[in-house]
Amino acid sequence: PIMDGSRLCGGIFSSKSGVEKINAAVTIDCTGDGDVAARAGVPFENGNEGLHITQPATMFFRIGNVNAEKLYHEIEAHKNDFYRKDGVNYRSLHWRVAEARAKGDWTLDRVSIGIFQGVKPDEWNINTSRIMGIDSTDSRSLTEGEIEGRRQVDEIFRFLKKYVPGCEDARLLCSGSTLGIRESRHIHGEKTLTLEDIIEGRTPHDSVLVCSNSADIHGRFGPKSNEYVVIQNGDWYGIPYGCLVPQRIDGLLLAGRCFSATSDAAGAVRV
């Protein structure tokens, strides 16, 4: 960062053109990890520092050539087996995961499959992999996560073809171009969004947008842990402008995953 006292005036960047100096009246940190803010000296927390963890990363992928009719029949036949909370079905295809685990074909610390039909009836999105202990502010950790994420994609895809009706002839169409990061730095701002703000559906006067996503917190108590906390008062909550304004530094704003929020509140607004 290029600083003039407590004001950020630009930065030194490395790009395909080489090392460049870019001056800016205002810089908006959209790095996801709050890289600019952290290097400028703004205080932050990395994940849930009380528990010394971050939410696990994931490697999303998409499959095609699925017989949707057979898959829907499988789900319909087990509709009474779903674990339900607040009217929402959880743990899709967990009966097949249990079968595969018993036969030694499932090594992941997951108990179910996140599977969602795409626009085309035969294309389905899979959100199941879970890579624990990844620090997205560390390049070596990111590399390890990429390798493990793609290994898990291979295992999950093999499982789908072998155990899930309708997926016998499925094809792996694509996977994420990079690791999906749920949590890293939470930059300290003039205001901080809390889980209570979300539950109570608070909309401060300086809200810059409103959200309706409930808190979806992964892996806080181990790789099989999932917490889902819904809004109890109203249908939405606001993100105050103060959450985008970092402490101590002028000329800098935050956007995206890194803005000022507690770890559990970030489980909602990260989406």
Predicted regions and their residues:
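Flavin (FAD/FMN)-binding glycine-rich loop and adjacent Rossmann-like elements that form
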Residues: 5-10, 14-26, 30-268
